[in-house]
Amino acid sequence: MDAIQTRSLTKYYGKARGIIDLNLAVAEGEFFGFIGPNGAGKSTTIRTLLGLISPTGGSAEIFGRDIAREREAILQKTGYMPSEAMFYPGMRVRDVLKLSAGLRKSDCRREADKLCERLQLEPSRKVDELSFGNRKKVAIVCALQHRPDLLILDEPTSGLDPLMQREFFDILGERNKEGATVFLSSHVLSEIQRNCSRAAIIREGRIIACDSVDALSRDSTKRVTVHGHVPLEGLEGIRDRQDADGTVSFLYSGDMNRLLRAFADGQVSDLTVSEPDLEEVFLHYYETADGSREAVSEGSGSQTGSTGESGFGKTASVQKDCGKDGEEL
């Protein structure tokens, strides 16, 4: 059974685009990454999956249950951490955790105490006295304390210091090994690369790439670093070129034979060809038609976005159906 299954899931805010025809399958027990900058549709996707907003079209299921008709049963098995960390002022941490557990009719005190200890969170503190990072810890405990089968996390590490980020991902890894499905929405690509087995990239409300993290990182692009002088003018497929002190480095997705001929015509003292990291691949997908790049900034996906055509060249009209293990839906 899939933990998450969407079929042409669509959300418009009036005439403004939210998400368009999302076809997504996340297997039970998978650690799945969802990548995109502000306004791409990440948070809209998550809020629609959780029934917090109603879709304009299409359908979605969580563990085989329809999100529109069986929301209460879905929430019993789901832990959700929003990108914001907002709570009722004046409440103490323990009261927030008790309220969250009560909504699921669960006694989570023992698990909450364990999580508070690991995250160095003091339950007696008032939430409005906490820093943003500590409020994020409260949100983490709320999402995890009932030991859900599915964790949906929207930009969870913003505000956490590096040590707490590491502890947080240790906890997620433990839960995933125990069988929980993790759906991680993030703009921090190193988090996706270290922790996720598969990922989807969303742009302007559409999934434009979906594959294993290894396959996305490999892509068909190579990072090339050359020491010496090589005639690269007119060679197609070069991006992100950087020249410094007799060394040129660039991403290359063109004909490798043509590149080798260029090396033969030049003077090369050293050469390195390596796989790009996920961040470089991601920026490739977000490259605009004129070769410039869209800004990729922190924060959660906006609820609204611009309409109109995509502007990133050959992949502009591509909409990927994201099945399991690369299969098409």
Name what the model sees in each region:
Residues G58-R69, A73-I74:
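Conserved ABC transporter NBD signature motif
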Residues R109-E129:
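Conserved ABC nucleotide-binding domain
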Residues I140:
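Hydrophobic anchor residue at the start of the ABC signature
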Residues L151-E155, L160:
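Catalytic Walker B motif of ABC-type/P-loop ATPase nucleotide-binding domains
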Residues F168-S253:
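ABC transporter nucleotide-binding domain
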Residues K222-A289, R293, S297, S302, ...:
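Short, charged/small-residue-rich alpha-helical element at the C-terminal edge
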